[in-house]
Amino acid sequence: MSICDMKIALANDHRGLEAKEQVKAIVSQLGHECIDFGTDGEGPVDYPDVAYQAAKAVSKQDADRAILVCGTGIGMSIAANKVRGVRAALCYDELNAKVSRNHNDSNVLCLSGDLLGAQALRKIVEIWLTT
């Protein structure tokens, strides 16, 4: 598998919608396929449900990695880490993204839709996907 042809599962709740759409664009620009388990609306969504679907896709090897977005990223991280074989990392900066891959072999990236701006999202996702 080349680093440029991964299947990336995406999931978000209502608070992570805008950030998920930004992440989806970044993932596509980097040449990866997106499998979207998240919501496309602003109505309330139970984050554990969508986190589980995306994490299960990684666990079953239907996706190579996953990126999950909710308000803080904490809930998605907790929910995803309940799935066997998943190593979800909540990352708020570039160093977290790099270390989570290099030292922890994370296969799920959890992000905050409320706390991260577009530039930070881009850098974190790019580093995490290329490390």
Predicted regions and their residues:
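Short, structured active-site "lid" loops
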Residues: V50-T72
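Short, Lys/Arg-enriched N-terminal segments with co-localized hydrophobic residues
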Residues: M1-D5
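Mid-chain, well-packed structural core segment of small domains
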Residues: L68-V69, I74-D114
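Short, solvent-exposed amphipathic alpha-helices that sit
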Residues: E18-L30
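A short beta-strand-loop structural module common to alpha/beta enzyme folds
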Residues: E33-P44
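Short active-site oxyanion
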Residues: K7-I8, A63-A66, G85-R87
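C-terminal binding/interaction regions
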Residues: A9-E18, E94-T131
